[in-house]
């Protein structure tokens, strides 16, 4: 308020100065000479008198202007002192201030992998509906397969998306026993080309990969914007995924949509990676089955991904190389989060490895151990959170099936598992399917 008042005083001083000079000039030109009244005839009869009058007026004006210059100098001096005191900007005002310590949002493209599904419209409609900024989240649709109907759907979005096309549509030479897997080879080829475009051609620092049959949650962009700095800062992480492999509605805590975990299993299905990771993977990218290849120890290198309690993507694509089998048995039951969580306003430091391992392991092994049958029949409800212990590959698979969680293992790692532990909801309470506390690593022979 004081600054506004001071600025107002300076402005009024300048206005008074200009107005005062205008009045003075008007006064000097219209006032009579000292001692007599002027008349047109007198001035016209005596040119010398006219000259003297003009000179006299000029002298008076000069004296008054000199006095006014002094006044103006005083105003300038007072303004200078006031500006130093209040640090008034002399340039255009700065941009709207950010919260201290909040970096500008990074540019993270959404790479949509498309082929021959014209239903890509459903995927793109949701992405565009929830996208908070076209500048920070450009959408790039990479199309394989040469399917014209799908191409027309993508083109209908105009400049809202960027449409690129994988140029090599030829069949891939494979061994006779792999001919039925031709689709998996083409998918791997497409991923390699599309990710190469994102990181090698467009030079983006990161990207979120989304398949054309995924629908995203309202806070999909918020989730990745918040976890991107964590992924950059923590070398023990190598991806952030929107997917929970055990995310069926009855197996998640719907009251905690903000809950995030570390997982040793690569989930895919809407995942964020950095350019540095692509530089590491591209030279050895596989010919086929790229996602299972990502789950091998030589690629994972002990690193983890972030995954949510409630998935931020949902697949609606029954059509695909797996012929709908996995979709019917599992994928279509995954719950999509509908409650917006302001992740960028939350403290996610609990996901850093040292803090997470300490707190998560204390939580799991601090929970009372209960036999799987007692969990199934909901005995000992008073215990609340419990732990079911397995000691072998076979006992893991048996207990997982009994409790309804995914029982397959990739290089020894269970889906959604971290340090061998799979955590989920069962009949309203938290259950941890866990190895003994002495666990010291995965056995790749557990497949």
Curated annotation (Swiss-Prot):
Instruction: List, alphabetically, the GO terms of the cellular component aspect.
Output: Golgi apparatus; Golgi membrane; perinuclear region of cytoplasm
Membrane topology is: Single-pass type II membrane protein
Tell where it localizes: Golgi apparatus membrane; Cytoplasm, Perinuclear region
Q: Which organism is it from?
A: Rattus norvegicus
Q: Write the protein's name.
A: Alpha-1,3-mannosyl-glycoprotein 2-beta-N-acetylglucosaminyltransferase
Taxonomic placement? Eukaryota, Metazoa, Chordata, Craniata, Vertebrata
Pfam families assigned to the protein according to its UniProt record, in alphabetical order: GNT-I (PF03071)
- What are the record keywords, sorted? Cytoplasm, Disulfide bond, Glycosyltransferase, Golgi apparatus, Manganese, Membrane, Metal-binding, Signal-anchor, Transferase, Transmembrane, Transmembrane helix
For this protein, the record's SUPFAM superfamilies field holds:
Nucleotide-diphospho-sugar transferases (SSF53448)
Q: Does the keyword Ribosomal protein apply?
A: no
The record's comment on cofactor binding reads: The cofactor is mostly bound to the substrate.
Q: Which gene encodes it?
A: Mgat1
Gene Ontology MF terms: acetylglucosaminyltransferase activity; alpha-1,3-mannosylglycoprotein 2-beta-N-acetylglucosaminyltransferase activity; manganese ion binding
* Needed cofactors: Mn(2+)
